Amino acid sequence: MAESNSWPKRLALLSASMLVSFLMAEVAVRLFTKVDPRFYNDADTQQHISPESDNRKDNPFGLPMGFHTTRTSTEAKHVGFVTRFNRHGMRDPVDYDFAKPADTRRVMLLGDSVVFGHVEESQRLPAALRRAMEKRSDGQKIETPAFSCPGWDFVSYMVLMQEAVSKFEVDDVVVGVVLNDFTGYEVPITEDGKIDVASLARQPDSTLSLTSAVKAVARHSALLTALAWASKGFYARKRTLEPTLAKLTKGQHAFDADVAKLEGGFRWLAKTCRDRKIRCLVMSFPYGPQLEEAFARQVIESWFGKTFSPEVVNDGPQRALAALAAKTGLEYLDLVPVYRQAGDVATLFFDTPEGRIDYVHLSARGNEVTAEALAARLSAPPQPLPTAATDTGAP
């Protein structure tokens, strides 16, 4: 009997010990760790914009990707910066009308976390591009709305573009791609030349899943927040970064099949822009180790622990993209020579909260350099492009 009576006491003691341990860990995390959530995908972003909404079910365009905002404008924090979102789900305080204002040139950007920005609002690529183009515009007003989100890929951009250009009046579309954006992704196109959105229904997120009650606690707990974001970071690396790195270390041949899968999407993009009389440009952001040997060593030692293949370092993926763009009738801007010419390449990239130089996300200077190159291209007449291969949106 005495033994049975001791179990409640033991359980109470164990519970008290666990609670004390949790509280001590919570205090330690708050004192010694800077918990600054970083968005890894649009589900993460949605949770911060409007936690009560679910962007798997509802967003401005009714698509399986994108944002839903329940208020006209919302704010969230991302890698230390306040991010404001308009009613369209863009990281932008301006609520753009679908119709373009008079005497205005509107350049729409599509991209992932690089376009979304790891910098202050005024330092982002859309803002820098607007300033750079206004210097060349002879008084014409410039608008640069941008649909962007951490975790998006080339398929995401095309889905958003199909809907966006049917609603927004635009003059130019710039699609900014990173090497991992086109690794293994193929745009599904129907027989009538449209993107098959229904086939892209979102799969359940494999990152840390919490009940509503635990989420309510986690929202106020630095410890649980840190654990949740560590889980998301691990999953994001396993799902997207490591497969891309495997190709980067194997050589150019590892990208060939993936680049070939883009052809249908590139053809669809070229035809859509041509039919709507929109100028379209694909722009590729390089990985830092491609730019300079000394910087490559610094980045690789900090992040990867492995060396990129010579083909990748020598711009093999970018050359493959340029060839595909020419084949399908798209303008293409390779930022590798732009960044090399800018010099001091380490300053082109964002410094992470952990004190490491990012290998792809741009600093304020990086965005300014990119914007100047892009504005120069867009201010010049379109380059002559082949048209024979762009008659259909289907592959």
Which role does the model predict for each range below?
Residues 2-20:
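N-terminal Sec-pathway targeting helices
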Residues 13, 24, 29, 262, ...:
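Histidine-centered active-site loop/cap adjacent to the catalytic His
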Residues 22-38:
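Membrane-interface motif at the C-terminal end of an N-terminal transmembrane signal
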Residues 26, 112, 157, 173, ...:
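Generic structural signal for small/hydrophobic residues in well-ordered secondary structure
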Residues 37-132, 136-139, 339-354, 395:
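Membrane/wall-proximal cationic-aromatic binding patches
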Residues 77-84, 100-101, 106-108, 114-209, ...:
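Conserved SGNH/GDSL esterase-like catalytic core that processes O-acyl groups on lipids
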Residues 113-119, 146-147, 255-259, 308-311, ...:
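Second-shell loop/turn segments in exported
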Residues 178-323, 330, 335-345, 386-391, ...:
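Serine-dependent acyl-ester chemistry module
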